[in-house]
Amino acid sequence: MKKKVLVGMSGGVDSSVAAYLLKQQGYDVIGATMQIWQHDEEFEEREGGCCSLSAVDDARRVCDKLDIPFYVLNFRDYFKEKVIDKFVQEYIDGKTPNPCIECNKHLKFDELLRRARGIGADYVATGHYAKIEKRDDRYLLIRSDDDRKDQTYALYNFTQDQLEHTLMPCGDYEKTKIREIAKEIGLAVHNKKDSEEICFISDNNHGKYISEAEPNRVKPGNFVDKSGNILGKHKGIVYYTIGQRKGLGLSLGRPVFVTNINAKTNEVVLGSEDDIFKTELIATDVNFIPFDKLEKEIEVTAKIRYSARPAEATLIPLPNGRVKVIFKEKQRAITKGQSVVFYDDEIVVGGGIIESII
């Protein structure tokens, strides 16, 4: 009997080809798009977001072409609770969150897997660029063959059970090959551009989005230097992130960068570029994949943001499941709320949320 797989379809080329590849491999494939959009006309009219209305239409057409069933699953309330509300609160708290990581953790590989099991599916699958392998008695998450498109940074929260029941067929290919396959089999999405912005923010202006969502909690305040001297006025801490230089609206006769955001005092601290280079951080909400718990100090490479190159670092276990990360070389703009992800060569060791910078 064929193994059944529920493929999360975004309407893009990657998940479309993932569904095709799995059908070719002999799986009983079902396509599904997570309905996450809110009751918002601008949101619903938006083109190209990963789960927008146009994405649903694209996904449905792909499933028709591949001759597989297609469903739209209502994740609206769950997405708001687990992703949007947390995103807004984190910015109000002076942090810079990564909503894609939360979506992967709570929706795509947790709730979607539960829904898949509810219809008798053995697996969920996505178009992510990453690989899953079983070595000895442990499932591992491995970097994609396409280094530029590798998405493991956003996938470090996997449990062993989730890895055992997840398929990622695009991880064995480069993006150019995925587009070639889509064109060869006649998929109209073969040249659809990649979605890079936050899917639920139509103009990619997160500050405006949060100000409209919580108008009473976003207030102007002071730009200050590290000694507390007032340098000017800011329009609300949600508009800024560590390392930011542009868009400050200040003319001080020298380049200044955001070095800290203090939610308690509603202040944005500015300093020189040297001030944003640090070597140590504390991470919380940590998950490890090759082992359950960090028992001793280990050497890894680590990324502090999606676009960063992995840098040599030491992991030191701390109480309450937290870890200290010490980089060999200073890192630019380590940011609270972002994730730090650990690697052993191509293997994802794990990751966590940056809680503080030392």
Swiss-Prot record:
Gene3D superfamilies: Adenine nucleotide alpha hydrolases-like domains, HUPs, Translation factors
GO terms of biological process kind: tRNA wobble position uridine thiolation
Superkingdom as given in the UniProt entry: Bacteria
Chain spans, region Interaction with tRNA: 149-151, 305-306
Binding site for ATP: 8-15, 34, 127
Keywords: ATP-binding, Cytoplasm, Disulfide bond, Nucleotide-binding, RNA-binding, Transferase, tRNA processing, tRNA-binding
Location within or outside the cell: Cytoplasm
Disulfide cross-links: 103-199
GO molecular function, one term: tRNA binding
Keyword Transferase applies: yes
Root EC class: transferase
Annotated transmembrane regions: none
This protein's record includes keyword Transferase: yes
Residues the record marks as active site: 103 (nucleophile), 199 (cysteine persulfide intermediate)
Catalytic activity: S-sulfanyl-L-cysteinyl-[protein] + uridine(34) in tRNA + AH2 + ATP = 2-thiouridine(34) in tRNA + L-cysteinyl-[protein] + A + AMP + diphosphate + H(+)
CC per GO annotation: cytoplasm
Site location (Interaction with tRNA): 128, 338
Homology family: Belongs to the MnmA/TRMU family.
Protein purpose: Catalyzes the 2-thiolation of uridine at the wobble position (U34) of tRNA, leading to the formation of s(2)U34.
NCBIfam families: PRK00143.1, trmU
Protein name: tRNA-specific 2-thiouridylase MnmA
Organism: Clostridium beijerinckii (strain ATCC 51743 / NCIMB 8052)
